[in-house]
């Protein structure tokens, strides 16, 4: 059986067609019932006329509730008044399940919709979100496959923290404490010595008690590690990747973007190269718009929001102070107080979507930084081992796919960008 989008063409006008889906809207007037049916591909109006159908059939159709699952058969006609420009003149139908009252109506509050996310996913708006997310995830993988990378898998349960332990979820593992992973980075680094270029897509977990519009406690993390490249080359790859993903979304999901009131032309204009601005310069930018930041202050969500309102495409902020970043980032030889790293900030107030850096590949430097950070050396023995046996320069990054989706779709809150958001106050449905 064809989808609604496949049926809704001039080629089928005058032909007998069949569609399956769910009742999106229904109304009756003067012995005619208009049923708008939806499936994942679109909507179409099915018209049932009382004088053309058995009385019991017409009565059943006219009493269908929203989200009833149905199958309609009839002749396809053109009709400019119908939502899609086509309608099916119904001659028979089947009800899979008839609903009375669907719980979700037009004017429901945000918390109600979150409590009933399992039903709200059916809305045309959220169907658009899901389609765009699918394109984003697929495009990320396609970009790296097309450039000779290997997709790999890493553990979710770990004993060693990538960036310290204050925001880790602790789990009892047969009497031993372990943690839910925040990043696959360390494990990806082990694999560059066999595959050189690797990536992964997996959930990450952060026990941050944050209530901002862009934070989740469980989020989808896309990460890559690459042998033989430096920080600047890593940024080259990332800006090409972002442009590739955005281009695929504008090509494949123009209708979905418009459904969400996102202008595809705005996204099409965001072509690389993206500006690369040193942290010391971004502090000056912040000061110029009235933000009282000084050198050594980290950029928070609000600062990033205000700074990125100045830009019409993503920017890189590079060379952060050493004290603000994790131990595995090497110092800049020309500026020993700074590290060879970068954050990519999305424009239009969305802020950080990528964090990346060159990685320390020298054994002595790594050991010194571990000790400076007062970390347990024994917990990192296997990570340190990588610097003993054929170590090479390498770089990597982590991309928050939900944040990327939020920006691409121009959504107000990250909870709108993921099917089932997990926050400090929400673990269901």
From Swiss-Prot:
User: What does the entry give for GO biological process?
Assistant: asparaginyl-tRNA aminoacylation
Q: Name one GO cellular component term.
A: cytoplasm
Q: Which Pfam families does this entry report, sorted A to Z?
A: tRNA-synt_2, tRNA_anti-codon
Q: Which keywords label this protein?
A: Aminoacyl-tRNA synthetase, ATP-binding, Cytoplasm, Ligase, Nucleotide-binding, Protein biosynthesis
Keyword ATP-binding in annotation? yes
Q: Which GO terms describe its molecular function?
A: asparagine-tRNA ligase activity; ATP binding; nucleic acid binding
By sequence similarity, the record places it as follows: Belongs to the class-II aminoacyl-tRNA synthetase family.
What protein is this chain from? Answer: Asparagine--tRNA ligase
Gene name of the record? asnS
């Amino acid at each position: 059986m064809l989808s609604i989008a496949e049926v809704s063409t001039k080629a089928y006008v005058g032909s007998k067609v069949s569609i399956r889906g769910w009742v999106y809207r229904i109304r009756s007037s003067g012995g005619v019932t208009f049923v708008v049916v939806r499936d994942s591909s679109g909507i179409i109006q099915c018209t049932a006329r009382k004088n053309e159908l058995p009385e019991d059939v017409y009565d059943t159709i006219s009493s269908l509730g929203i989200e009833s699952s149905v199958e309609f058969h009839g002749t396809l006609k053109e009709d400019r008044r119908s939502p899609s420009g086509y309608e099916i003149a119904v001659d028979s139908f089947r009800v899979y399940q008839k609903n009375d009252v669907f719980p979700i109506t037009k004017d429901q509050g945000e918390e109600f919709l979150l409590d009933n996310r399992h039903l709200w996913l059916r809305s045309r708006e959220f169907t658009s979100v899901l389609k765009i997310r699918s394109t984003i995830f697929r495009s990320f993988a396609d970009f790296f496959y097309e450039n000779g990378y290997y997709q790999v898998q890493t553990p979710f349960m770990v004993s060693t923290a990538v960036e310290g332990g204050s925001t880790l979820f602790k789990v009892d593992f047969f009497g031993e404490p372990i943690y839910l992973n925040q990043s696959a980075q360390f494990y990806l680094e082990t694999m560059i010595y066999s595959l050189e270029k690797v990536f992964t897509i997996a959930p990450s977990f952060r026990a941050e008690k944050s209530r901002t519009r862009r934070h989740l406690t469980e989020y989808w993390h896309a990460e890559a590690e690459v042998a033989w490249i430096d920080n600047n080359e890593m940024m080259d790859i990332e800006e090409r990747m972002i442009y590739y993903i955005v281009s695929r979304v504008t090509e494949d999901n123009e209708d979905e973007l418009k459904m969400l009131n996102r202008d595809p032309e705005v996204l099409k204009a965001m072509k690389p190269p993206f500006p690369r601005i040193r942290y010391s310069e971004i502090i000056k930018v912040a000061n110029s718009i009235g933000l009282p930041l000084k050198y050594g202050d980290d950029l928070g969500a609000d600062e990033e929001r205000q700074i990125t309102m100045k830009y019409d495409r993503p920017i890189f902020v590079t060379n952060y102070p050493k004290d603000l970043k994790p131990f595995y980032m090497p110092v800049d030889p020309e500026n020993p107080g700074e590290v060879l790293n970068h954050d990519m900030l999305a424009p239009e107030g969305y802020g950080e979507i990528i964090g990346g850096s060159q990685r320390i590949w020298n054994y002595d430097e790594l050991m010194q930084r571990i000790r400076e950070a007062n970390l347990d050396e024994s917990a990192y023995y296997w990570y340190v081992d990588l610097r003993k046996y054929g170590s090479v320069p390498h770089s990597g990054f982590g991309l928050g796919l939900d944040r990327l989706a939020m920006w691409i779709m121009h959504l107000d809150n990250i909870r709108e960008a993921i099917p089932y958001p997990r926050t400090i106050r929400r673990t269901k449905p």
